Each structure stands twice: as structure tokens, then as C-alpha cells.
Amino acid sequence: MDILTLGWVGLLGLFTYSIAMVVWGRHGM
């Protein structure tokens, strides 16, 4: 796997995780 691809996957995963935490926090989970 290319290092650039790995970086994008990591960044996208971190972004998705952050959104999920905010949504769950608002719903009181």
C-alpha cells in the first residue's frame, strides 16, 4: 500500500470517528 493512500485512510477514519463521537454525545449514548 502506498504511504499517501495510508495517510488518507487514516485521516478519513479519524474524521469519521470524530463525527461519530459528536453524534453519540448529542444522543446521550
UniProtKB/Swiss-Prot annotation:
The answer to whether UniProt assigns keyword Thylakoid to this entry is: yes
One Pfam annotation, family name? PetN
List UniProt keywords, sorted A-Z: Electron transport, Membrane, Photosynthesis, Thylakoid, Transmembrane, Transmembrane helix, Transport
SUPFAM superfamilies under this entry? PetN subunit of the cytochrome b6f complex (SSF103451)
Residues spanning the membrane:
3-23
BP GO terms, sorted: cytochrome complex assembly; photosynthesis
Q: What does this protein do?
A: Component of the cytochrome b6-f complex, which mediates electron transfer between photosystem II (PSII) and photosystem I (PSI), cyclic electron flow around PSI, and state transitions.
Alphabetical list of NCBIfam families matching this protein:
PRK14747.1
| Record-given protein name | Cytochrome b6-f complex subunit 8
Could you tell me which species this protein originates from?
Answer: Cyanothece sp. (strain PCC 7425 / ATCC 29141)
**Lineage of the native species?**
Bacteria, Bacillati, Cyanobacteriota, Cyanophyceae, Gomontiellales
The gene is petN
